[in-house]
Regions:
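Bacterial Sec-dependent N-terminal signal peptides
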Residues: 1-21
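Carbohydrate-active catalytic/glycan-binding domains of CAZyme proteins
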Residues: 20-170
Length: 170
């Protein structure tokens, strides 16, 4: 019994192996509301998920799922919680576009079954710069007691004159 106690204490005091979270590689990603962009030989797929889920691939057959979303929990902009009571970290339906040498990513903040929602915007100079996303704020918001529409499902459109527009659904 004395030996067991010494071994148990030694195991508890031994340093634990610490490793960074490894990306998961899959050949068939199952996602909601995907959007894909291509930059410098790599495909970037963004989709509904906690902090905006992100995957990368060089061949569109083998996808590496990032262990954390584009926005980590601590990086979710404060305005999202102010605009959408009850919103946490589950971000919906991103859309991404390159416009004038910059990437823009629009996303929806909402709670299921409500039409108090908001569409936010992030910008970055490169999709490969995972720490370079800058919050550009809220583009549009809907309020359940005010509006009969819902600010979700953003989509960028560039017209024939090169002017950018944002459409959204619901």
């Amino acid at each position: 019994m004395k030996y067991f106690g010494i071994v148990a204490i030694a195991m508890m005091l031994a340093p634990a192996e610490s490793r960074a979270q490894q990306p998961l590689v899959v050949d068939t990603p199952f996602v909601h509301d995907p959007v894909m962009a291509y930059e410098n030989g790599k495909y970037y797929l963004y989709c509904t998920g906690h902090g905006i889920s992100q995957m990368t691939s060089t061949d569109r057959k083998h996808w590496t799922i990032a262990p954390q979303g584009v926005l980590r929990n601590s990086e979710i902009p404060a305005w999202t919680h102010d605009s959408v009571p009850g919103f946490t970290t589950h971000i919906w339906a991103p859309d991404v576009i390159r416009f004038k040498n910059k990437w823009y990513l629009a996303y929806s903040c909402s709670t299921f079954g409500k039409n108090t929602s908001a569409i936010g915007l992030l910008s970055n100079t490169s999709l490969s710069d995972k720490d370079g996303w800058k919050d550009e704020g809220c583009l549009v918001a809907s309020k359940g007691d005010r509006d009969n529409w819902n600010a979700i499902d953003p989509n960028f459109v560039i017209d024939e004159k090169g002017k950018p527009w944002l459409t959204w659904g619901s």
